[in-house]
Amino acid sequence: MPPFATIPATERNSAAQHQDPSPMSQPFDLPALASSLADKSPQDILKAAFEHFGDELWISFSGAEDVVLVDMAWKLNRNVKVFSLDTGRLHPETYRFIDQVREHYGIAIDVLSPDPRLLEPLVKEKGLFSFYRDGHGECCGIRKIEPLKRKLAGVRAWATGQRRDQSPGTRSQVAVLEIDGAFSTPEKPLYKFNPLSSMTSEEVWGYIRMLELPYNSLHERGYISIGCEPCTRPVLPNQHEREGRWWWEEATHKECGLHAGNLISKA
């Protein structure tokens, strides 16, 4: 049995609650900690994240396979902080799934929304589907990046469900721990944990099925990588999962900007 699948589903409600330690008062050696975590299980990586940042660690949940990240974090800390982006263009199935996860774990999910002062002029000037003509950058910038930037401005550390196998072009070098190259500032470094980075899609789904976790029903219809409804479609059996996102654009540009550090580090 792999190290990331050690907690039976029957123990979900009986596991002892984790008490958050206080965040570290002194900076840690980032390269040393990253190196020590490189071969650890996702649970060990999350445990280290909670040990160093306590209640200042936030979990990012996209309404897709990263329910695995939420499950692992919740089992370590029943008061885990989770946020999710509502772009206003998600599938109905994704909205229902976010509520299902909220109810399943009994947690609050901080749902982030676009700033209407930015969104309304875009829609008024260019309509609802300008991304098919102009590319997805402008729309994602308003619907995703700005709300996330606003959220992360008050956060010291966050954890994402990024995996290396999700995109050979932009995520193959995702580290388990890094300084976020997209949202850090010289005055305020933002620490980013990627506990699932070494897991494969098969391992993620093995975890979901073994523990009978809730999942987005779109997965049953051929959707693997799930984003906004107009920009996501099912993939064929031999296609990579990212081919279902922004299919009208060049393959190497298929990042919305939430993890722009992946592109910055490759520049």
Swiss-Prot record:
SUPFAM superfamilies reported for this sequence: Adenine nucleotide alpha hydrolases-like
Q: Which GO terms describe its cellular component?
A: cytoplasm
Active site annotated at which positions?
A: C256 (nucleophile)
Q: Which residues bind [4Fe-4S] cluster?
A: C139, C140, C228, C231
Pathway(s): Sulfur metabolism; hydrogen sulfide biosynthesis; sulfite from sulfate
Q: What is its EC number?
A: 1.8.4.10
Bias (Polar residues) ranges: 11-25
What is one Pfam family matched by this protein?
PAPS_reduct
GO molecular function term, any single one: phosphoadenylyl-sulfate reductase (thioredoxin) activity
Q: Which reaction does it catalyse?
A: [thioredoxin]-disulfide + sulfite + AMP + 2 H(+) = adenosine 5'-phosphosulfate + [thioredoxin]-dithiol
Q: Which InterPro entries match?
A: APS_reductase (IPR011798), PAPS/APS_Rdtase (IPR004511), PAPS_reduct_dom (IPR002500), Rossmann-like_a/b/a_fold (IPR014729)
Q: Does the keyword Iron-sulfur apply?
A: yes
Q: Where in the cell is it found?
A: Cytoplasm
UniProt KW Glycoprotein keyword: no
The similarity annotation says: Belongs to the PAPS reductase family. CysH subfamily.
Q: What does this protein do?
A: Catalyzes the formation of sulfite from adenosine 5'-phosphosulfate (APS) using thioredoxin as an electron donor.
Quote the protein name from its UniProt record: Adenosine 5'-phosphosulfate reductase
Q: Which organism is it from?
A: Pseudomonas aeruginosa (strain LESB58)
